A protein has these predicted regions:
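Short, polar N-cap/turn motifs at the start of nucleic acid-interacting alpha helices
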Residues: 202-209, 293, 312-331, 356, ...
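Basic, Lys/Arg- and aromatic-enriched nucleic-acid-binding interface segment
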Residues: 7, 118-126, 137-200, 205-206, ...
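N-terminal core-binding DNA-recognition domain of tyrosine site-specific recombinases/integrases
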Residues: 3, 17, 23-29, 55-56, ...
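C-terminal secondary-structure termini that scaffold catalytic or DNA-interacting sites
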Residues: 172, 207, 216-237, 242-244, ...
Length: 386
């Protein structure tokens, strides 16, 4: 219900919201007051009406409880979101009321952050947009103010790829008890947390497979977290390439305890391996081989790129990598220079075959004659060079 009454030289519109509370606005002209009241009634009828008081809540006052109730997030993801909020979102936008967080305000914040930290700006923008979508769903604001085109795109540099020979050299450069970590990361395309979570029970040498059932990660606070992979796609069984089986068999016999829950990737004394120890050994190995540009995760990237080069389909790459969407697997469909050259040669071969099939017998005879080196050329002195 809405009414419009004269108040001195102005017109006051009164609108009763669905909660029974009255909201008033004063306008210099009667028509403006009537239009406002009609607009409020229309929003209410369409289910789009929002209590103006909701928009007074600040970004920080909404974002903090939002993150606290996200029980579906992993510990590492919560830490990342907390870092982005405290370091890049709340210092600039935390005190801004939700209703005042307009697209222009967001665009100005993003532009400033992107000049300093492009990749971080993309991550922070995606998080802010996610929070604002929640604010829209909670009817705190009418629309998402995050409207920067491409704001959430990271444009990260293409990650380096190790060759098969380089992976072998990197494995040899690792301490003996960690050599198999390099082989599994590359040939079985395991993530670091999956490597550290691998147990004896997860390895089936008889059938040549390993199961990704547990991951181990370290929080920013230094606590080790052991849990199941965060997605259904991440829980998978991977076929072990036959070239890795002998090394893995020897590793299990020499370094891994008989208990089914014994860790496969172990420390020097046979205990659980700490992530920082693996990182330190990896840093030394890549320096020894001359590939300091490679991260440990790039071994997985390299292995998936090899798989794509053999002709693996997107579905096959998704299953092996534990990806839940085709978008993640598509990045491995890019061709290396060697693969691209092989494709070009194959295409040229198709063209040659088509040409040979189409020429006449007389042309074919001419080609055979012209392909023989002439006697004069065979005995001609070589041209001098300058």
């Amino acid at each position: 219900m809405a009414t419009v009454k004269r108040r001195g030289n102005a017109w006051q519109a009164t609108f009763r919201g669905p909660d029974g509370r009255e909201r008033t606005r004063t306008f210099p002209r009667k028509v403006d007051a009537e239009n406002w009241a009609a607009d409020e009634r229309s929003k209410l009828m369409r289910g789009e009406w929002i209590d103006p008081r909701s928009g007074r809540v600040t970004v920080k006052a909404f974002a903090d409880p939002w993150l606290a109730r996200r029980q579906d997030l992993s510990v590492r993801t919560v830490e990342l979101y907390r870092y982005l909020l405290d370091g890049h979102i709340l210092p600039s936008l935390g005190g801004v009321p939700l209703a005042a967080l307009t697209p222009s305000v967001v665009a100005a914040w993003y532009a400033k952050l992107a000049t300093e930290h492009k990749t971080t700006a993309a991550k922070a923008y995606r998080l802010l947009s996610q929070i604002m979508r929640a604010a829209v769903a909670d009817r705190m604001i009418g629309s998402n103010p995050c409207q920067v085109k491409g704001g959430g795109v990271e444009n990260a540099a293409e990650r380096p790829i190790a060759s098969v020979a380089e992976v072998g050299a990197l494995a040899d450069a690792m301490p003996e008890h960690l050599r198999v970590a390099v082989l599994l990361a590359s040939w079985c395309q395991l993530r670091r947390a999956e490597l550290l979570g691998l147990r004896r029970r997860d390895v089936d040498l008889l059938h040549g497979t390993l199961s990704v059932a547990v991951t181990r990660t370290k929080t920013m606070a230094g606590e080790m977290i052991e849990k199941a992979p965060k997605s259904e796609a991440g829980r998978r069984t991977v076929a072990i390439p036959s070239n890795v089986v002998p090394a893995l068999t020897a590793h299990l016999e020499r370094y891994v305890g008989s208990d089914p829950d014994s860790a496969v990737i172990v420390g020097e004394k046979g205990g659980r391996l700490l992530p920082q120890v693996l990182s330190a050994s990896w840093s030394k190995a890549r320096e020894k081989v001359g590939r300091t540009d490679l991260r440990l995760h790039d071994l997985r990237h390299s292995g998936l790129t090899w798989a794509a080069a053999t002709g693996a389909t997107i579905a096959e790459l998704m299953r092996r990598a534990g990806h839940g969407s085709p978008a993640a697997a598509l990045r491995y469909q890019h061709a290396t220079e060697d693969r691209d050259r092989a494709l070009a040669d194959a295409l040229a071969g198709l063209a040659s075959s088509a040409r040979v099939a189409s020429i006449t017998p007389r042309e074919r005879k001419t080609l055979r004659i012209s392909s023989k080196p002439s006697e004069s050329l065979q005995h001609a002195p070589s041209a001098s060079t300058t």
